[in-house]
Amino acid sequence: MANYFNTLNLRQQLAQLGKCRFMGRDEFADGASYLQGKKVVIVGCGAQGLNQGLNMRDSGLDISYALRKEAIAEKRASWRKATENGFKVGTYEELIPQADLVINLTPDKQHSDVVRSVQPLMKDGAALGYSHGFNIVEVGEQIRKDITVVMVAPKCPGTEVREEYKRGFGVPTLIAVHPENDPKGEGMAIAKAWAAATGGHRAGVLESSFVAEVKSDLMGEQTILCGMLQAGSLLCFDKLVEEGTDPAYAEKLIQFGWETITEALKQGGITLMMDRLSNPAKLRAYALSEQLKAIMAPLFQKHMDDIISGEFSSGMMADWANDDKKLLTWREETGKTAFETAPQYEGKIGEQEYFDKGVLMIAMVKAGVELAFETMVDSGIIEESAYYESLHELPLIANTIARKRLYEMNVVISDTAEYGNYLFSYACVPLLKPFMAELQPGDLGKAIAEGSVDNAQLRDVNDAIRSHAIEKVGQKLRGYMTDMKRIAVAG
């Protein structure tokens, strides 16, 4: 199998990278009716598998779970979750032949084995669904020509997909049809019905492509969403302790600081996050972010280049074949870092304190979000896609760190995201060490002293923040998400 993207000519590559259309709510007037009365079989019962299935069943669809024989015989976690929630469970051989839509929600590294097992069992004219296009785009999986291949990709972890549905809402979602596999021209109807059944149509749906979803998703998770948070956590903790801060306090300031800061980002973009600072602190955060962007731009561009070329995917798949040696080594090393092993702080940190003493962290968020967005757009990805894969998902990832530090983040994200995170953070930490050595008092761990500011400078900085393209597209997209619940901010 060959990387699908690399088999396309330049015009086709650009067309698929740039496919992105915000769909109107009237396009979902029929809800999930196209799949009513049809058999939907989900392969895999992890966070996405279970929670999408619960939503789809509540939307009136016929949902069952196909699991490997060993998982059923040994009553593994996937079997327990499906059966405890009242779903029909069976082997591939029992359920796949009757399925009208088979949805593969297993981890990326299992996709080829799963598709190899289920494809011969699928009836003529059935559909195969994904929530991430890695197997199609990067692996280059060949699917039978009579099978329709679609994607519905919620831009949130599976738990959020369920919680927002229960509130009568949903999460922003990308949908796509694989252009090589739409023999009956029904792919979009299937994808729309599936998205509606999960509740995604209530929060905004982008019609995208497998290529655009994969390339933007990989870029976001490697850089700002996971890699920048990991690198920032390690660098900021070490800096605080080096300057005499109690390790327990330093750990809490960082662990819960990302979540608190990015909650403002979620509600009002970079503008609101920066507005939480005093005027002197805002000017300093802006200056720091510009320095960071200049330093990190080549690293962000390298990650985007390696994602576009397929270099990243081939390296990761080589590690899969080597029993995840690199991944497991990096995971173990991360668990032994000073940040991960620091004691817990029992005192309370007020919400504003996270902003006042986290000017550098805010600068890192601003720089990382803007760089990821700019680098994607420069590579042909449309602004709406770039927004979802940079700014939108950041509060959700920050929330995982608030639960159990970097360990929790790396457990919750996919192995693909975790591998990319380590590649980025292992390069970013040494890259930023000279910058960290030049920080001033008030940049981290202490509030910047109040003082006079130059009105013209403040005006220009405010204009620069608010006029960035991500702020303009973000304001539009957040208009569809006003009902999404706040992420709880810890004390």
UniProtKB/Swiss-Prot annotation:
Pathway annotation: Amino-acid biosynthesis; L-isoleucine biosynthesis; L-isoleucine from 2-oxobutanoate: step 2/4; Amino-acid biosynthesis; L-valine biosynthesis; L-valine from pyruvate: step 2/4
Enzyme class: oxidoreductase
Protein name in the entry: Ketol-acid reductoisomerase (NADP(+))
Gene for this chain: ilvC
UniProt record similarity statement: Belongs to the ketol-acid reductoisomerase family.
Active site: H132
UniProt keywords, alphabetically: Amino-acid biosynthesis, Branched-chain amino acid biosynthesis, Magnesium, Metal-binding, NADP, Oxidoreductase, Repeat
Catalytic activity line of the entry: (2R)-2,3-dihydroxy-3-methylbutanoate + NADP(+) = (2S)-2-acetolactate + NADPH + H(+); (2R,3R)-2,3-dihydroxy-3-methylpentanoate + NADP(+) = (S)-2-ethyl-2-hydroxy-3-oxobutanoate + NADPH + H(+)
Superkingdom, natural source: Bacteria
A GO molecular-function annotation: ketol-acid reductoisomerase activity
GO terms under cellular component: cytosol
Domain KARI N-terminal Rossmann, chain residue ranges per copy: 15-208
GO BP, sorted A to Z: isoleucine biosynthetic process; L-valine biosynthetic process
Positions with a binding annotation for NADP(+): C45, G46, A47, Q48, R68, R76, S78, D108, K109, Q110, G158
Binding-site residues for Mg(2+) 1, renumbered to this chain: D217, E221
Residue positions binding substrate: S414
